[in-house]
Amino acid sequence: MNILTDPLKLKTSGCADANASKCAEGDGEGSVQVQLDPNVKIGSAKVFSIYGKGGIGKSTTSSNLSVAFSKLGKRVLQIGCDPKHDSTFTLTKRLIPTVIDVLEEVNFHSEELRPEDFVFEGYNGVMCLEAGGPPAGTGCGGYVVGQTVKLLKEHHLLEDTDVVIFDVLGDVVCGGFAAPLQHSERAMIVAANDFDSIFAANRIAAAIQAKSKNYGVRLAGIIANRSRETDQIDKFGAATGIQRVAHLPDLDVIRKSRLKKMTLFEMDHTDEILAVQQEYLRLATEMWEAKTPPVQGKPLKDRDIFDLLGFD
């Protein structure tokens, strides 16, 4: 059975076939909403999506959070949802083939694939997958995400998984790259203590709340990353009710871990590293035990964000 249609052949006028994820009508400018097929849901695993401004450190955060869950004894699957397919390289020490790569090799006949063709074991047993995506300017990345989940279910790879982490492309909040929210119970936003990333976080929060009207996903809060201080993030939180759930400081050793293709849990155990490891373990524990309650906050209008942030 061929469960994935070539994304380059997708049209905005409708789905590729009757079994594909449903597509809403276009908005007149070529945009479509990719909606979850009710028959394709992740099972009993806890599912989290990580969003944030491009380059803010989502992949570093996601990978170290995945390891933290694995250190708690959980079976973890990390799914990279970016055509750059670099979400998992600190876990696997290489750029692994994407789902799109391997499907192209078999002319999109998914029944010819084996699990080891597209799922790879990384550090401390974290299972890694890169969804990939169509070339720039073509197809729909959200469709690829939805069909990746279908492929995982087809091979029964979600049955022995406790935690799934979606690491999602930049600050794109279109219907396509919002697709992981349809599978998630909690979404977190990675932001630094600066205007641009908080501005992006505000827009992402609005997208998450829009999805929460039809799906079970709820915003859990903001992970402050690459930031010595958190005063601007906390000011934003006070104005919106969107709380900060973790603080990961701006340390050179974190940058070096990416260059060494390592997670922070593999680096030399300095006091700095141990403190950051403990912060990841604390956050993973709270996420697992559902101690990160859903945010009932209200994102601000763009002009209000502009007026709010900055020094008096």
UniProtKB/Swiss-Prot annotation:
Its EC number is 1.3.7.7. One of its GO terms (biological process) is light-independent bacteriochlorophyll biosynthetic process. SUPFAM superfamilies: P-loop containing nucleoside triphosphate hydrolases (SSF52540). CDD domains: Bchl-like. Pfam families: Fer4_NifH. Its cofactor is [4Fe-4S] cluster. It catalyses: chlorophyllide a + oxidized 2[4Fe-4S]-[ferredoxin] + 2 ADP + 2 phosphate = protochlorophyllide a + reduced 2[4Fe-4S]-[ferredoxin] + 2 ATP + 2 H2O. Mg(2+) binds at S59. Binds 1 [4Fe-4S] cluster per dimer. [4Fe-4S] cluster binds at C140, C174. Keywords: 4Fe-4S, ATP-binding, Bacteriochlorophyll biosynthesis, Chlorophyll biosynthesis, Iron, Iron-sulfur, Magnesium, Metal-binding, Nucleotide-binding, Oxidoreductase, Photosynthesis. ATP binds at G55, I56, G57, K58, S59, T60, K84, N225, R226, P249, D250, L251. Pathway: Porphyrin-containing compound metabolism; bacteriochlorophyll biosynthesis (light-independent). Signal peptide: none annotated. GO terms for molecular function: 4 iron, 4 sulfur cluster binding; ATP binding; metal ion binding; oxidoreductase activity, acting on iron-sulfur proteins as donors; oxidoreductase activity, acting on the CH-CH group of donors, iron-sulfur protein as acceptor. Homodimer. Protochlorophyllide reductase is composed of three subunits; BchL, BchN and BchB. Component of the dark-operative protochlorophyllide reductase (DPOR) that uses Mg-ATP and reduced ferredoxin to reduce ring D of protochlorophyllide (Pchlide) to form chlorophyllide a (Chlide). This reaction is light-independent. The L component serves as a unique electron donor to the NB-component of the complex, and binds Mg-ATP. Belongs to the NifH/BchL/ChlL family. This is Light-independent protochlorophyllide reductase iron-sulfur ATP-binding protein. It comes from Rhodopseudomonas palustris (strain HaA2).
